[in-house]
């Protein structure tokens, strides 16, 4: 009986010790809440077109932020200071970005400090050969369209391309138009853009990698 009590007491002691260790781990792992007025959460979305298509097609909207998706972004910005980059298709389904009107241009410009737009791909269907051959034309179409309906200040300085694909010719085009920052793959073992396996692994390990004047950042 006495031996049994000792075993139970030992087990309880071990459990208490494990709880204490776990509590200390949680305490040191979770960041201390900040009262700073300069807190920023940066969030980015790929494959964007439905919210922009809705703005184009729904005539009753008198503000960007009547559209449900943009309304949600505005609420997150107002409450948490979140800033957003939306990476858009040139075309998808019945959407063509060159058809977007400039109805909300001034409002986009007024909110461009926290809401940006950038190129993502020609369309959802991914074809490496087409994406490479048509890249400059498609990139400029999207860029000019964003300038038309959202203004220069709404252009995202950092891009994330479809499937993290960009060969050397596409990278050269990006540099031609002063784009020097790319968001890379966030999963281990995946190739990002024109980086080789070793370089992509370094990007994953270090969270950032500079190669040939391009600054690659882990998504």
Predicted segments — roles?
Residues 17-25:
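Hydrophobic alpha-helical membrane-insertion segments, chiefly the h-region
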Residues 67-72, 96-109, 144, 194-218:
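Alpha-helical scaffolding within the catalytic cores
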Residues 46-48, 89-91, 122, 161-164, ...:
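An acidic- and aromatic-residue-enriched active-site/binding cleft used to recognize and process polar
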Residues 27-108:
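Active-site beta->alpha N-cap acidic-glycine motif
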Residues 1-17:
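N-terminal Sec-pathway targeting helices
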Residues 18-19, 31-32, 153-154, 163-219:
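Active-site-adjacent pocket scaffolds in enzyme catalytic domains
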Residues 75-80, 145-149, 177:
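Structured segments of extracytoplasmic/periplasmic soluble domains
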Residues 83-167:
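Metal-dependent polysaccharide deacetylase catalytic core of the NodB/CE4 family, i.e.
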């Amino acid at each position: 009986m006495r031996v049994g009590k000792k075993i139970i007491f030992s087990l309880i002691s071990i459990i208490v010790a494990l709880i204490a260790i776990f509590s200390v781990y949680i305490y040191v792992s979770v960041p201390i809440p900040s009262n700073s007025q300069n807190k920023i959460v940066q969030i980015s979305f790929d494959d964007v077109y439905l919210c922009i298509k809705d703005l184009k097609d729904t005539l009753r909207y008198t503000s960007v932020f009547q559209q449900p998706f943009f309304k949600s972004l505005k609420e997150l910005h107002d409450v948490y200071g979140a800033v957003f980059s939306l990476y858009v298709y040139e075309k998808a389904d019945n959407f063509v970005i060159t058809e977007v009107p400039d109805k909300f241009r001034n409002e986009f410009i007024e909110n461009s400090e926290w809401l940006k737009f950038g190129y993502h791909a020609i369309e959802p269907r991914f074809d490496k050969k087409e994406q490479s051959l048509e890249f400059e034309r498609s990139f400029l179409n999207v860029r000019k369209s964003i300038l038309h309906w959202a203004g220069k200040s709404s252009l995202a300085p950092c891009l994330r391309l479809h499937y993290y694909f960009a060969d050397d010719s596409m990278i050269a085009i990006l540099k031609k138009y002063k784009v020097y920052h790319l968001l890379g793959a966030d999963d281990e073992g995946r190739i990002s853009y024109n980086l080789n396996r070793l370089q992509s692994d370094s990007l994953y390990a270090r969270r950032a990698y500079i190669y040939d004047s391009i600054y690659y950042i882990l998504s």
